[in-house]
Amino acid sequence: MKKITPKAMCAWIPKREDETHKGDYGRVLIVAGNKQFGGAAIMAAEACVKSGAGLTTVASDSVNRPALQTRIPECMFIDYENITSLSEQISQFDTILIGPGLGLDAYAEEIFRLVLQKSTEHQQVIIDGDGITIYAKGENPHPAAKLTFTPHAGEWERLKVLAPDAVTPTDVALAIDATIVLKGHRTKVYSGESAWQNMYGTPAMATGGMGDTLAGTICGLMAQTEKPITGTLAAVFLHSYIGEILAKKRYVVLPTEIAEELPTYLKIFSETDEHA
């Protein structure tokens, strides 16, 4: 199993070229946050924007719009109850995150199916939180888009039921044709025959919303990097690396504090020579 290291980060995060514009840094759709869990959508969106995604749009319950756009005015918004509008816009995005705070009711399942059905082979879809639970029911067709799952331990137990003959996480990743970010104290990433282990993290990060921030960082960086797996690995590293640094002076590290530091550390790693 390969280690995710600071040296690798220096190669994964490119400097920004002068002759570029917001369209060059990815168009991201985040489908998240029902009436009860709007904070999940906000934390994911904040991490996505601050990881450098060029254009970020959130599809959520309309009650979340004022809070979202007050905190993150850079985000655009789609009322996900207008399912026709959402359906028409799905194809416009490079990367889609679905699941944080989405809920498990019939409407959440309808939206989830819509996103999978409308996604194309040219898109990346990250499935997090409630999205994993819905997908694990086994009632959804495998979409044309490339999938990444971000399960914690409980969600992992549900997800691996889809691959009953699998022995290892690599077996599961191959069986469901997806990348798996298996979250834990030392998060592991499985993609095809390859596997990586993160070397950073701290119990100070054990607080609600941390997974939403990681998912937002993944979709933000995946939208910018040449290879999706590179963006995924970079996000896993940065999320824990920043958390560990902040924990040196904090008993608990909040997800929003990690998001706030993303631009600073992205700049540091983008300007550090990997051979130094």
UniProtKB/Swiss-Prot annotation:
Keyword check for Hydrolase: no
CDD domains, sorted: YXKO-related
Residue ranges annotated for the YjeF C-terminal domain, each copy included: 5-269
Reaction(s) this enzyme catalyzes, per UniProt: (6S)-NADHX + ADP = AMP + phosphate + NADH + H(+); (6S)-NADPHX + ADP = AMP + phosphate + NADPH + H(+)
Residues that hold AMP according to the record: G211
GO biological process, one term: metabolite repair
EC number: 4.2.1.136
Positions annotated to bind (6S)-NADPHX: A40, G103, H152, D212
Cofactor(s) the protein requires to work: Mg(2+)
GO MF term set: ADP-dependent NAD(P)H-hydrate dehydratase activity; ATP binding; NAD(P)HX epimerase activity
Pfam families: Carb_kinase
Enzyme class, UniProt record, top EC level: lyase
Keywords assigned: ATP-binding, Lyase, NAD, NADP, Nucleotide-binding
Family per similarity comment: Belongs to the NnrD/CARKD family.
Subunit details: Homotetramer.
HAMAP family assigned: NADHX_dehydratase
Task of the protein: Catalyzes the dehydration of the S-form of NAD(P)HX at the expense of ADP, which is converted to AMP. Together with NAD(P)HX epimerase, which catalyzes the epimerization of the S- and R-forms, the enzyme allows the repair of both epimers of NAD(P)HX, a damaged form of NAD(P)H that is a result of enzymatic or heat-dependent hydration.
Protein name: ADP-dependent (S)-NAD(P)H-hydrate dehydratase
Species of origin: Listeria monocytogenes serovar 1/2a (strain ATCC BAA-679 / EGD-e)
